[in-house]
Amino acid sequence: MIKRLFDLFFSFFGLILLTPLFILIALWIKLDSKGSIFFRQERVGLEGVIFKIHKFRTMESSSENQVRLTIGNDSRITKSGQFLRKYKIDELPQLIDVLIGKMSLVGPRPEVKEFIKEYPLEIKDKILSVRPGITDMASIIMVNENEVLEKYKDPMKAYIDIVLPIKQKHYLDYINNHNIWLDLKIIFLTFKKIFTR
């Protein structure tokens, strides 16, 4: 209950405060390339319910339906998208998802269905027992995930075999130990990581 009130408060006032920035970003995206302002993609949320996540579009619109993994300096990424991705600004519209109850500020990142299928059953059920988050400890530790995957001959296999198990460990650690102070710590560490890259 406290966590949900925390999410509601910060997502509501965050969206109000960030509205001018959102307008500027929307204009930049539209001027930079053809297509929509937002990128919507199906993700698996609380109790396995599918929802469409909100992100600022960072790739050519013709590539949107193909996106599962983005590796290194992907040629599909727009000029505005490079900046938005570097500072994780493309994730800010997920405050909408937090406000409507599909996500939380902090929690396991929501995956696409094909990667959820790779989760061991006992792990999957536990991870899907909480709302997915905009940020978490795995996102902080693996902030350069795309660059790491670029080094592998088969990035998709590397993601499933190497990256996912690491993420799952951090997801479970969070679920087993989460409290409001841990959420505040993760939010602080997220900003610190973004602005010291």
Q: Which residues does each PLM region occupy?
A:
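Conserved catalytic core of Hanks-type protein kinase domains
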Residues: 30-31, 86, 98, 143
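A hydrophobic, helix-centered structural microdomain
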Residues: 1-61, 174-197
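C-terminal terminal-structure detector
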Residues: 128-197
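Positions in alpha-helical segments
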Residues: 11, 39, 78-82, 114, ...
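A short, structured surface patch at a secondary-structure boundary
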Residues: 72-132, 136
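Residue-level recognition of specific faces of alpha-helices
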Residues: 27, 40, 55, 76-79, ...
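Intrinsically disordered, low-complexity boundary segments flanking structured domains
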Residues: 23-27, 41-42, 116, 123-129, ...
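Short, glycine-rich, amphipathic interfacial segments at transmembrane boundaries or analogous
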Residues: 39-76, 110, 138-166
